[in-house]
Curated annotation (Swiss-Prot):
Complex formation: Homotetramer, a dimer of dimers. One homotetramer interacts with 1 SecA dimer.
TM spans (from-to): none
MF annotations from Gene Ontology: unfolded protein binding
Task of the protein: One of the proteins required for the normal export of preproteins out of the cell cytoplasm. It is a molecular chaperone that binds to a subset of precursor proteins, maintaining them in a translocation-competent state. It also specifically binds to its receptor SecA.
Protein name: Putative protein-export protein SecB
Matching Pfam families: SecB
Subcellular location: Cytoplasm
Species this protein is from: Pelagibacter ubique (strain HTCC1062)
Keyword Transcription regulation: no
One GO term describing the cellular component: cytoplasm
Family listed: Belongs to the SecB family.
Gene: secB
Length: 140
């Protein structure tokens, strides 16, 4: 099956690591395994079948915890969609499923490097994100 889109570029649009002070770092270092990874995907048309797809990862503690660090990345993919794609569902699948599945290994590597370089080495995400499954759940 041929793909009905092509990723013509990827870049880090925004990346953030926030640990406000030393007591917070010491607290977070012991609690970071309880942090949750959240994902958000949004897109916008650029021009002539080109779409900007932003995949956002946020790694943080529960809102009520006062001593916490926050990590976030917005990874942008520039996608050229085949002109034959006119169905809204097909476009949605490209944006929410196909592109994220393709770029996720690089995005995860970059994000884990951010965590390591921020003083929190050895973090691993328990399971790989299955964007196909998330897309199917969303459709139901």
């Amino acid at each position: 099956m041929t793909e009905n889109y092509k990723i013509i570029g990827n870049f880090i649009k925004d990346m953030s690591s926030e640990t406000p002070d030393t007591p917070t770092y010491i607290f977070v270092r012991d609690k970071i395994s309880k942090y949750k990874l959240n994902i958000d995907i949004n897109s916008k048309a650029v021009k002539n079948g080109i779409i900007e797809v932003n995949t956002i990862l946020r790694f943080s503690d529960q809102p009520e915890i006062l001593k916490k660090a926050h990590f976030e990345i917005t990874y942008t993919s520039i996608v050229k969609v085949d002109e034959k794609v006119s169905d809204k569902k097909e476009m949605e699948k490209i944006i929410l499923c196909d592109v994220p599945n393709k770029i996720y290994p690089d995005l995860e590597r970059i994000f884990l490097n951010l965590l390591t370089d921020s003083g929190y080495p050895g973090i691993k995400f328990e399971k790989k994100i299955d964007f196909t499954e998330l897309y199917k759940q969303r459709a139901n």
